[in-house]
């Protein structure tokens, strides 16, 4: 066995050297630190739902206000084990793509960078390529990159739903695949208009940086509380409002939230529509970023393609 391991290491020695050169040590340490913290902390976190009324001091402070206290008590969304598990899941999903982006590098062209970047952060790809499109003679590669990354986001959302609540996949797969299909086909057509490729570097923060993970965790908790609050106040409409608002900032948190809530009482149709609304909201934000941060001609092409993707996806959702 040892001989096989040694032989295998020698066979990939050159690739390991290349890997070491492209991955910075602080990124390695960040990943190790994150993994250790998760392994050590996760098993000890309580896997039960709490509300802030379970904090004795807060419970006493709200005791004179029974109606408000009763409402707050219904916001029992604080499950520390599941919250941190979601952070680990999203960070891990992003980190795989992040490592591939670092290994491949921008010298392989905007196509691969945008494809993998869409799995890390399609918004980051949009911001970076939009800013770099200004003053460029050829804008087609930038349209291609933004549309490609945005289309991959639809697939990423489907993966997240499949992992958290696969019962929703059957209702989401056709609309999301339709959106992705229109975007990917459009990106392919755009790439054939002019053959010029650009090798622009797209910057991402390591998903395993502890600060980045904690920020996502806090935002996820905020979206959980917001969604449950609006649901209690306005019913299904509250979920839709939360989805639209959350999608403006980050699609992952609301996708995880609605997928989780659908396991504990939220109607699947409401969760599905909420996820579609969040995806639409997030896509419209990327169109806005392209317009205000990038070349206007480039942004108009991005707008046409992505809006068409949304229209097709929504139409499919209404038919199924």
Which residues does each predicted region cover?
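Transmembrane helical segments that form the transport core of multi-pass membrane transport proteins
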Residues: 16, 198-265
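Membrane-water interface at loop-to-transmembrane-helix junctions
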Residues: 24-35, 71-85, 199-226
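Membrane-interfacial helix-loop connectors
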Residues: 116, 120-121, 127-139, 145-152, ...
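Transmembrane helix-loop junctions at the membrane interface of multipass transporters and ion channels
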Residues: 45-55, 147-170, 288-295
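Entry/N-cap segments of selected transmembrane alpha helices
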Residues: 56-94, 174-179, 210-219, 296-311
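C-terminal transmembrane helix pair
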Residues: 155-159, 173, 266-320
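Cytoplasmic-side transmembrane-helix entry/capping segments in multi-pass membrane proteins
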Residues: 2-4, 21-33, 105-116, 137-148, ...
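C-terminal ends of transmembrane helices
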Residues: 9-23, 95-104, 126-136, 188-198, ...
